[in-house]
């Protein structure tokens, strides 16, 4: 089969090759094999190319791709109910999606929303499930609270803005540049702050009358973390979801005394629906139980059907364009989600 392969650890442009000789993977018990129609790009793909982050290490050669849309064409024992259904899926070990066939555990497979096409559906699962878990299961966002989204024009940021607006929150977005700010405002944010040129603390405090943000979803991390902490309200919740600025550091080296001084909570979240062995727990992985996934997906599908949320598609690309697209992601030259459309043959091909 055809697939986007990492053949060596390096930057995406040097790590990736599109190969036509990759074996079709065998379906496993409790899992499904999806005939993929579309697969999304993620910042995590960049880390996998480089091979520098322990939590996402894989030995080349391997296939990229964390979330997909397609038709289930085979299923292992216990997952037969999915055969023939149009689904979205989170792939096994968050790998293998950018291929003609991909494997996913049944706990990570859901009905594709009927109101979304395949490219939109592939762009839907990871950011909207993560955003919903962050806002409603972990941060407990309330109507009328102020939500600050750091990295608002990203795939996850655009999802969280829409979810915040749908929940009745006042949304403030941080984005890098006026064009990205316009994207955030178009999704319902009350205020877009250009963190490359503006004083973030002053803008947030002026907008909230000195209160600060009740919930902060930080999708970037890194050098701006301490500034963002000063924007959190008393009894607020700071949710570090992404570490795109420095994926290896996160909160490492940050003076956590400032968390105590600020009287706010740091609230973790990671997307995953499974029961993991204690050996996994020893390394810090503690996902949501399997029954939570269908509950979240049903709530999100209802919001799609109501017209309240929709994935922002930045680019529809072919497999041949993945390496260049990931380079652009790495340099913050994108907005929304970039999605591999498997009906596209190559650069510039028509749908």
Tell what function each PLM region has:
Residues 1, 298-316, 323-351:
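C-terminal capping/lid region of NAD(P)-dependent oxidoreductase domains
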Residues 124-198:
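Mid-domain Rossmann-like dinucleotide-binding core that forms the NAD(H)/NADP(H) cofactor-binding site
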Residues 12-13, 21-69, 78:
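N-terminal glycine-rich beta->alpha transition that marks the start or flank
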Residues 35, 47, 88-151:
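NAD(P)H dinucleotide-binding glycine-rich loop of Rossmann-like/cofactor-binding domains
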Residues 49, 53, 69-93, 115:
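A glycine-/small-residue-rich N-terminal strand-loop-strand element
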Residues 86, 146, 170, 236-237, ...:
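Short glycine-centered segments of the SAM/dcSAM-binding site in methyltransferase folds
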Residues 223-306, 343-351:
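Glycine-rich phosphate-binding loop and adjacent beta-alpha segment
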């Amino acid at each position: 089969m055809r697939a986007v392969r990492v053949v060596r650890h390096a930057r995406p442009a040097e790590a990736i090759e599109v190969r036509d000789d990759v074996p079709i993977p065998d379906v496993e018990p409790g899992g499904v094999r999806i005939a993929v129609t579309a697969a999304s790009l993620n910042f995590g793909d960049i880390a996998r190319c480089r091979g520098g982050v322990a939590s996402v290490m894989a030995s080349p050669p391997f296939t990229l791709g964390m979330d997909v849309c397609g038709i289930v064409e085979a299923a292992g024992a216990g997952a037969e109910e999915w055969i023939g259904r149009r689904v979205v899926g989170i792939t096994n070990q968050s790998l293998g999606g950018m291929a003609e066939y991909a494997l996913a555990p049944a706990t990570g497979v859901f009905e594709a929303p009927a109101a979304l096409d395949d490219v939109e559906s592939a762009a839907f699962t990871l950011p909207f499930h993560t955003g919903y878990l962050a806002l409603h299961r972990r941060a407990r966002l309330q109507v009328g609270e102020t939500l600050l989204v750091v990295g608002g024009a990203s795939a996850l940021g655009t999802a969280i803005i829409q979810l915040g607006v749908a929940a009745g929150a006042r949304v403030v977005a941080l984005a890098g540049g006026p064009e990205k700010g316009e994207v955030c405002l178009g999704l319902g944010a009350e205020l877009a702050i250009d963190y490359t040129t503006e004083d973030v603390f002053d803008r947030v405090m002026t907008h909230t009358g000195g209160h600060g943000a009740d919930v902060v979803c930080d999708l970037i991390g890194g050098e701006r973390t301490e500034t963002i902490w000063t924007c959190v309200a008393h009894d607020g919740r700071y949710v570090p979801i992404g570490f795109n600025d420095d994926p290896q550091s996160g909160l490492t080296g940050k003076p956590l005394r400032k968390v105590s001084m600020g009287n706010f909570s740091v609230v973790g979240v990671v997307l995953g629906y499974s029961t993991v062995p204690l050996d996994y727990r020893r390394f810090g992985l503690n996902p949501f139980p399997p029954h939570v996934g269908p509950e979240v997906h049903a709530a999100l599908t209802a919001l799609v059907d109501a017209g309240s949320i929709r994935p922002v598609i930045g680019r529809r690309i072919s497999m041949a364009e993945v390496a260049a697209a990931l380079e652009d992601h790495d340099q913050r030259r994108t907005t929304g989600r970039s999605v591999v459309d498997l009906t596209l043959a190559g650069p510039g091909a028509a749908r």
